[in-house]
């Protein structure tokens, strides 16, 4: 299996995000707070998912600034998608989070057509 051309870029991106989140340099959008409450995603699960996550989509031209979609798993094995800003911001902005629907995602990484 070949490595996609964006692999190194995605690895550098998640590494930078992990460092900031581990040091507490992140904040939640109001939307993320609302969605985390509705979807029962506690702060610890955000941290766990980012700590072992990978960037699966990149949105360099997102309307509020570059962001990406991270897939990570909690220690309980729960898959979580987290959309967050790139690490170029002083604080990582958590934009939204949800548990991916298997009917919409294959292996939680690739959108079904």
Regions found by a protein language model. Name each.
Residues 1-113:
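Ribonuclease/tRNase effector modules and their secretory precursors
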């Amino acid at each position: 299996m070949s490595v996609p051309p964006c692999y190194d870029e995605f690895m550098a991106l998640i590494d930078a995000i992990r460092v900031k989140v581990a040091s507490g340099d992140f904040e939640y959008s109001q939307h993320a707070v609302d969605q985390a409450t509705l979807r029962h995603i506690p702060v610890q699960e955000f941290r766990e998912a980012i700590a072992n996550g990978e960037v699966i989509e990149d949105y360099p031209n997102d309307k509020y600034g570059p962001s990406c979609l991270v897939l990570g798993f909690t220690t309980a094995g729960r898959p979580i998608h987290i959309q967050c800003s790139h690490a170029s911001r002083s604080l990582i902005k958590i934009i939204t989070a949800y548990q991916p629907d298997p009917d919409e995602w294959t292996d939680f990484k690739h959108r079904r057509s």
